[in-house]
Amino acid sequence: MKLKLALLAGAAPAAALYGAPRPVQIIPSVLPADFAALGLDCTALEKAGCDRIQFDVMDGNFVPNLTFGPDVIAAQRKTTKLMFETQLMVSERCTDAMLPQFTEATKGPNGEPGVVIVHVEACTHIHRSLSNIRAMGGSPSVALNPSTPAEAVENVLDLVDHVLVMTVNPGFGGQAYIPTMTDKIEKIRKWIVDRGLDVDIEVDGCVKIKSSRRLRAESLRRPPRHRRDACSMAWRYRFLTVRPRRRREMTW
């Protein structure tokens, strides 16, 4: 089974981070799903109890793969009431030109802000891109590749709701977790906690039971268990701790 896991550690007080295990969300990526039955798959995910659906958008330029555009994402709104999350793994020209369409397509069933993730490597003016997402009614979030230092996002932490740390090179599944990314995650988490920001950290890429142990130990004390019953297909899962205000809670 292919897994795409993310551990999300919000900027709660330090005592909460190091204390009892925090609740988690399960957010599957539909990248490995059957595109011919994507709507049925999204409906199945909602019935399985998932909290949000993640779409990996690739343009064949920024990463060596090609997936779907905003119309495909928007069409899935008819099949589920779950919130969406869109990660734009696309070139700068595509990011700037398509932000309005993707932000609109990612919104919830009642116009709630959907999570729109842009890569810091693809945005010369990252402040402007993130501010535009917020102004257009989205939830601005930033991602950084393994080769990008944590300092690249330090000056935009006050503009985002999430920071996504890629622990493999984006584009294809089946890659090994890069161990040095754990230190990067810890550095970003420390900045968030020290500043008292309400920002979550997502960890994306081959986060399996072994690699998750250290991540959970540093931010949540305990590693997550593997949820095999959430979906029968070889979809990639995201395990995220959530902020206390969110509706569903599960402890691990």
Regions found by a protein language model. Give the residues of each.
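Glycine/Thr-rich beta-alpha phosphate-binding loop at enzyme active sites
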Residues: D59-T67, D71-V72, L82, P146, ...
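Structural preference for solvent-exposed beta-strand-turn elements
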Residues: I133-A135, L197
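Conserved N-terminal beta1-alpha1 strand-loop-helix module at the mouth
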Residues: L17-V115, E121-C123, N132, P140, ...
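Catalytic cores of alpha/beta
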Residues: C42, R93-A105, T148-L159, C206-R221, ...
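Hydrophobic faces of well-ordered beta-strands that scaffold small-molecule active sites
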Residues: V24-S29, I53-F55, Q76, F84-L88, ...
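Cleavable N-terminal signal peptides of Sec/SRP-targeted secreted and luminal proteins
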Residues: K2-A15
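Conserved, mostly hydrophobic/aromatic
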Residues: L38, L45, D56, F102, ...
